[in-house]
């Protein structure tokens, strides 16, 4: 007699003994999805909390003195800025988010790429991950910037023009002057103590470098070899010009801009390579192995087959 044994792929069981497909609880999955989204929003809020506290409160920067013969803080105050805060935020955020939306829709609609997210709609899931990572990086970058500004309190190039100290009450022969009184508007004086490091340089470098790395990961069309590098270098030149304009506007020292570039680039690289999945290798799910029939022979069958081969 011959008997057959089937080896079947083992399906992992859930806690109550059944397969995952049979134990899929929609209500439990929905509550877990909401919990994860709330956790992400909480993390985003905590990342932006230092920035929000410093910008909306009366926290004053460190009060630093000066030298009377310091030429680096004697520049005039320019009323107009080459790139103001509104333009910086609008261009940096809008361009990046629009490009991310376009890239993710193309990836899902035309390339038919799937997502393992708990969010069922693939478009919403992709935008949630990529835009969420970008906004998280913006919050981290701005929090770093504001912490440095209030902690160091470096004087801007136009500090003396804004402060307008009474030099008749100051003895410049003492060298470093710490006891002085500013006759200028207090809000402008406090802002003139936030030179290091440049927020425009750090924000523009973060947004543009993040978009450069996003294009490197998502722009896979090989039709025009120089199109992607052209777009990437254009974005970097926009960030570079933004930082340099702060020097010509007498808002920052050159070292402030360089430090801002370095901080923005560092945060962008950390977010792209350690937080997002842009450059992570995608693993494919392997299908269960088919059932394999193995023939089990009894001792009598083995002897019969042996005799048959000997006769042949």
UniProtKB/Swiss-Prot annotation:
Q: Which UniProt keywords apply?
A: Cell membrane, Endoplasmic reticulum, Glycoprotein, Golgi apparatus, Hydrolase, Lipid metabolism, Membrane, Phosphoprotein, Transmembrane, Transmembrane helix
Q: Which SMART domains match?
A: acidPPc
Record topology, Extracellular segments: 55-85, 145-194, 245-258
Start and end residues of each stretch annotated as Mediates interaction with CTNND1: 276-312
Motif Integrin-binding motif: where in chain: 183-185
Spans annotated as Phosphatase sequence motif I? 149-157
Under the heading CDD domains, the entry gives:
PAP2_wunen
Q: In which pathway does it act?
A: Lipid metabolism; phospholipid metabolism
Q: A Pfam family matched by this chain, by name?
A: PAP2
Q: Which InterPro entries match?
A: P_Acid_Pase_2/haloperoxi_sf, P_Acid_Pase_2/haloperoxidase, PA_PP_rel
> Which Enzyme Commission number(s) are listed?
3.1.3.-, 3.1.3.4
Q: Does the keyword Protein biosynthesis apply?
A: no
Q: Name one GO molecular function term.
A: integrin binding
Comment, domains? The integrin-binding motif mediates the binding to integrin alpha-5/beta-1 (ITGA5:ITGB1) and integrin alpha-V/beta-3 (ITGAV:ITGB3) and is required for the function in integrin-mediated cell-cell adhesion.
Q: Which family does it belong to?
A: Belongs to the PA-phosphatase related phosphoesterase family.
Per UniProt, subunit arrangement is:
Forms functional homodimers and homooligomers that are not required for substrate recognition and catalytic activity. Can also form heterooligomers with other PLPP2 and PLPP3. Interacts with CTNND1; negatively regulates the PLPP3-mediated stabilization of beta-catenin/CTNNB1.
Q: What does this protein do?
A: Magnesium-independent phospholipid phosphatase of the plasma membrane that catalyzes the dephosphorylation of a variety of glycerolipid and sphingolipid phosphate esters including phosphatidate/PA, lysophosphatidate/LPA, diacylglycerol pyrophosphate/DGPP, sphingosine 1-phosphate/S1P and ceramide 1-phosphate/C1P. Also acts on N-oleoyl ethanolamine phosphate/N-(9Z-octadecenoyl)-ethanolamine phosphate, a potential physiological compound.
Q: What protein is this chain from?
A: Phospholipid phosphatase 3
| Organism listed in the record | Rattus norvegicus
Q: What is the phylogenetic placement of the source species in the record? A: Eukaryota, Metazoa, Chordata, Craniata, Vertebrata
Q: Which gene encodes it?
A: Plpp3
